[in-house]
């Protein structure tokens, strides 16, 4: 095992001492399933201490009120509830407790906004009389800043390079597979040519960013169309992201962030770019929502999330207290 691999494993083990529930989420991630249209999704019918899924891989909620209007909380892993110690402490479950609505968890780990709305379409919920709330935003920007192509029609998704390699293997056969395996060995031992610059040249960050906004606008239009057809409302909420908050970090948060940096050293460049794009991205999202007619809310401005309370399990995912705080802000600011 390389020194980097040992450091990464040690960082994960230390993290698990602080947030032991993350062991369950790591296991869930290792068991993800490839599914049509969405590309990948959570494993079906899972029962772990911190998280469970139904027969479709959708996370279960607690406190359902079948006689009440159904509402959807749509998004990626923060909506799914990575970091929560149980299904009862996710945002949708907390909203079931705090409102008179019946909230469903439409969160998908590592999803972009297109995958998020596709999940809504595929589920084909017949009676959605409550609001549609999309809590998202960080994954879209992160993926747009990563190397690789970004289509203004199809967008891009996490693990796309893995999918492209598998498609290439299927197309060219064993000889090309051998070449790719050898290239992988060369890369592992630092013998491969640097390809990052070439990958980025195929689609500059500026072009990827513009394409991402175009795709996001289309996704918001779809969300608004569904809301109008069902006679309800749609909202987009920019999720809280620790580097975008003027937050006093707790001892636990400082420790967790340091361990994450130790586990994934190369992510520091992405963090710097996310910070650089912050203000422009917030402005662009607000403009798109106003244009489409979707209500907009930025939780990174919320003073309640800037207090010296332990709210984050990592920079994107929250603790039980963090998810409860977000649920209460949604109820207040969206009049749920």
Language-model-detected regions and their locations in the chain:
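Serine-esterase "nucleophile elbow" of acetyl-processing enzymes
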Residues: 53-133
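Histidine-centered active-site loop/cap adjacent to the catalytic His
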Residues: 36-37, 283-298, 308-336
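Second-shell loop/turn segments in exported
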Residues: 78-85, 105-106, 209-213, 274, ...
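Interaction-surface signature
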Residues: 9, 19, 114-200, 204, ...
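N-terminal secretory targeting modules
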Residues: 1-71, 127-128
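Conserved, well-ordered alpha-helix/loop/beta-strand core segments that scaffold catalytic motifs
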Residues: 132-136, 192-302, 333
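Short, amphipathic alpha-helical "lid/cap" segments that border enzyme active or binding sites
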Residues: 113, 117, 213, 217, ...
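Generic structural signal for helix capping and beta-alpha/helix-loop junctions
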Residues: 81, 113, 141, 244-246, ...
């Amino acid at each position: 095992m390389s020194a980097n691999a040992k450091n990464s494993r040690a960082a994960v083990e230390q993290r698990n001492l602080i947030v032991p529930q993350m062991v369950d989420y790591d296991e869930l991630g290792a068991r993800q399933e490839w599914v049509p249209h969405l590309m990948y999704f959570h494993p079906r019918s899972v029962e772990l201490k911190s998280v469970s899924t139904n027969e479709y891989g959708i996370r279960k909620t607690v406190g359902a009120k079948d006689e009440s209007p159904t509402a959807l909380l749509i998004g990626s892993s923060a909506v799914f509830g990575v970091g929560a110690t149980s299904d009862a402490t996710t945002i949708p479950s907390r909203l079931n407790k705090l409102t008179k609505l019946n909230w469903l968890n439409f969160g998908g780990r590592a999803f972009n906004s297109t995958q998020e709305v596709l999940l809504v379409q595929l589920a084909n919920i017949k009676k959605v009389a409550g609001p549609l709330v999309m809590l998202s935003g960080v994954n879209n920007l992160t993926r747009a800043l990563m190397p690789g192509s970004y289509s203004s029609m199809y967008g891009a998704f996490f693990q796309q390079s893995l999918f492209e390699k598998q498609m290439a293997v299927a197309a060219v056969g064993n000889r090309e597979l051998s070449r790719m395996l050898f290239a992988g060995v060369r890369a592992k031992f630092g013998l491969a040519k640097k390809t990052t610059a070439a990958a980025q040249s195929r689609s500059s960050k500026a072009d990827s960013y513009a394409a991402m906004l175009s795709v996001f606008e289309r996704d918001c239009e779809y969300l608004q169309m569904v809301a109008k057809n069902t006679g309800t409302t749609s909202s987009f909420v920019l999720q809280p992201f620790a580097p975008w908050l003027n937050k006093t970090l707790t001892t636990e948060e400082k420790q967790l962030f340091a361990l994450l940096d130790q586990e994934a050293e190369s992510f520091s460049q992405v963090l710097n770019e996310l910070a650089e794009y912050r203000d422009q991205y917030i402005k662009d999202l607000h403009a798109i929502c106003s244009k489409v007619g979707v209500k907009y809310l930025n939780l990174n401005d919320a003073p309640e999330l800037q207090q010296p309370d332990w709210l984050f399990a990592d920079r994107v995912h929250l603790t039980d207290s963090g998810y409860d705080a977000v649920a209460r802000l949604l109820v207040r600011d969206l009049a749920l």
